[in-house]
């Protein structure tokens, strides 16, 4: 078997459903298996997914064991030459799956590969490639220097934005949202460190792969990852959890550094955590309703009718345009010359009318200002955006 896809799920059944649908398209020519470990979800994930995807191997945990242990449970059963650690809130493409396999087949020194992750507005997610968080690199990241000087090879090394994102490059740290690992390399390094409950485990594994003499690569192959939109990285909870993981990594791999060197790191960690906490208090005092979306909807007549009902209910003050089309009739989608994007902020694609690969390609090549992506399927009857899932069945019952 060539590939084992491993997904850890926790209460995101609709995003997972879409991820699995994209995998069906992406792996049709690859011998593979898909293993989903459910961390005791309470949203009915088990019943919902297993009835729709009977070929997926479903492992239901009795409690939330965290991301690392969830993946390790699947690693122990995986049979593929390559292992793809994949987040459920992603859309993958045939280009990404087959491109990574082809690259690793021809580069035997590659331990793991990462890809070009898109945000829902089509922009590049900087966490697609990262450098090892050495004491200095970590300090620059946590103090904000890397944000002030993103292109600097000295201060902005964490996200490596000085590298050409359209070219394959050796990097150090690969995101656990999409990490294709050589099974042989994982056997040599050992599985994920379960002390990392959430965040940091991908950094630790990437580093251990490098220490075994392998190389890690970034490949300019597109996938979409919703996390960049749906996770507020300025909240106290996120900052505390993430930087606590950084502390664990620092203690594990740089314990030989003196207290005087580690002190600035800890100051930066807690400084960012305090700022996030204070900022969060101000945000809670001034909660504003999100403005209505202005949508271009492209798809079949059936999908247009259903999405129209959802938008009339949820974004009734927005301006919406509906275009009956598919990939064969209108391959340029929302980028067609006949469509003006000036008044719109969101494009909704019918995933039965356009392949996921085409949707991401169009999203990534949008000229001028960015358009946020939403998807709809008449099979699931769910409108999925970066921050919400709208159920047509709920809307139709209210009518």
Segments and roles (model prediction):
Residues 60-78, 99:
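Glycine-rich, basic loop-to-helix element that forms the pyrophosphate-binding segment
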Residues 132-171:
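Short, flexible, basic/aromatic active-site loop/helix in glycosyltransferases
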Residues 22, 38-46, 63:
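A conserved acidic beta->alpha catalytic loop
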Residues 1-24, 288-290, 340-341, 387, ...:
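N-proximal low-complexity "stem/linker" segments adjacent to membrane-targeting elements
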Residues 91-127:
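Conserved donor NDP-sugar-binding/catalytic core segment of glycosyltransferases
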Residues 21-31, 314-315:
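Short, acidic, metal-binding catalytic loop of nucleotide-sugar glycosyltransferases
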Residues 207-282:
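Active-site-adjacent helix/loop segment of glycosyltransferases
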Residues 83:
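Short aromatic/hydrophobic "clamp" motif used to bind/position activated sugar donors
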């Amino acid at each position: 078997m060539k590939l084992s896809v491993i997904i850890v799920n926790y209460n995101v059944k609709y995003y997972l459903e879409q991820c699995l649908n994209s995998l069906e398209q992406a792996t049709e020519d690859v011998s593979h298996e898909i293993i989903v470990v459910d961390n005791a979800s309470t949203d009915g994930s088990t019943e919902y997914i297993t009835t729709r995807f009977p070929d997926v191997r479903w492992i239901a945990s009795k409690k939330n064991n965290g991301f690392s242990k969830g993946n390790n449970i699947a690693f122990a059963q995986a049979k593929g030459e390559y292992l793809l650690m994949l987040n459920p809130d992603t859309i993958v493409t045939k280009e990404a799956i087959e491109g990574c396999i082809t690259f690793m087949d021809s580069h035997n020194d590659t331990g793991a590969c990462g890809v070009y992750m898109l945000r829902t507005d089509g922009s590049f997610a900087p966490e697609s490639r990262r450098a090892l968080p050495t004491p200095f690199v970590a300090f620059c990241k946590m103090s904000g220097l890397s944000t002030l000087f993103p292109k600097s090879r000295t201060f902005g090394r964490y996200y490596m934005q000085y590298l050409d994102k359209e070219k394959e490059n050796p990097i150090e740290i690969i995101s656990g949202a999409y990490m294709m690992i050589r099974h042989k390399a994982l056997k040599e390094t050992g599985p994920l460190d379960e002390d990392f409950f959430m965040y940091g485990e991908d950094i630790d594994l990437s580093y251990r792969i490098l220490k075994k003499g392998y190389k890690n690569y970034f490949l300019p192959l597109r996938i979409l990852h919703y996390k960049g939109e749906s996770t507020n990285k300025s909240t106290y909870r996120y900052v505390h959890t993430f930087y606590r993981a950084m502390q664990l990594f620092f203690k594990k791999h740089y314990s030989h550094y003196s207290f005087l060197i580690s002190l600035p790191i800890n100051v930066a960690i807690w400084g960012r955590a305090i700022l996030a906490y204070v900022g969060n208090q101000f945000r809670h005092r001034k909660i504003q309703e999100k403005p209505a979306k202005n949508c271009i909807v492209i798809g079949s007549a059936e999908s247009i009718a259903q999405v129209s009902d959802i938008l009339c209910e949820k974004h009734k003050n927005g301006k919406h345009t509906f275009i009956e089309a598919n990939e064969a009739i209108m391959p340029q989608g929302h980028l067609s010359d006949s469509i003006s994007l000036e008044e719109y902020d969101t494009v909704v694609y019918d995933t039965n009318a356009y392949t996921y690969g085409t949707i991401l390609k169009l999203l990534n090549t949008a000229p001028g200002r960015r358009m946020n992506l939403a998807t709809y399927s008449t099979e699931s009857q769910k409108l999925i955006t970066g921050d919400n899932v709208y159920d047509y069945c709920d809307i139709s019952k209210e009518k």
